[in-house]
Design a protein with these regions (language model features):
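Cytosolic, long alpha-helical scaffolding segments
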Residues: 1-136
Length: 136
């Protein structure tokens, strides 16, 4: 299970970087301001989440994992809202198919990335709880 989640994380990161690099390297149009703003929001939230997870493991304060998991379910919902926002943008304004493909692809992979990280955390939380039960 752990290996599968790590592989999912790796594949999501690889897809996001590869698709973005190809888009830029092929001189496609830049993303719209709203799209860039949305991606920056996600980037900031993802950075905060990963820093919090890193701090948990550095301090070995594993009781905080449950809190992170609960908070980050809201993060997945936020990404879903951003996807819906883009659907509404497409309906009201003209958009480049290449930009839309890149944007949706990155959003969906980010959502998969978050879910894989959360699944890995949940698995570790379960392991930690079982370990505590055995030591009691």
């Amino acid at each position: 299970m752990v290996l599968r989640y790590l592989q999912d994380i790796s594949q999501s990161i690889s897809y996001i970087t590869s698709a973005s690099y190809k888009h830029v390297n092929n001189n496609h149009k830049v993303l719209k301001k709203g799209q860039i703003k949305d991606l920056k929001e996600i980037d900031n939230e993802l950075s905060v989440m990963l820093k919090e997870i890193s701090a948990i493991f550095e301090t070995r304060n594993f009781t905080e994992i449950g809190k992170i998991i609960e908070e980050r379910r809201d993060f997945v919902n936020h990404v879903t809202e951003i996807i819906e926002r883009q659907v509404n943008r497409i309906r009201t304004e003209e958009s480049s198919p290449k930009n839309t493909t890149l944007y949706f692809g990155n959003l969906l992979e980010t959502k998969d990335l978050i879910q894989a990280v959360m699944s890995l955390l949940e698995l570790y939380q379960e392991f930690e709880l079982n370990l505590r039960k055995q030591t009691l």
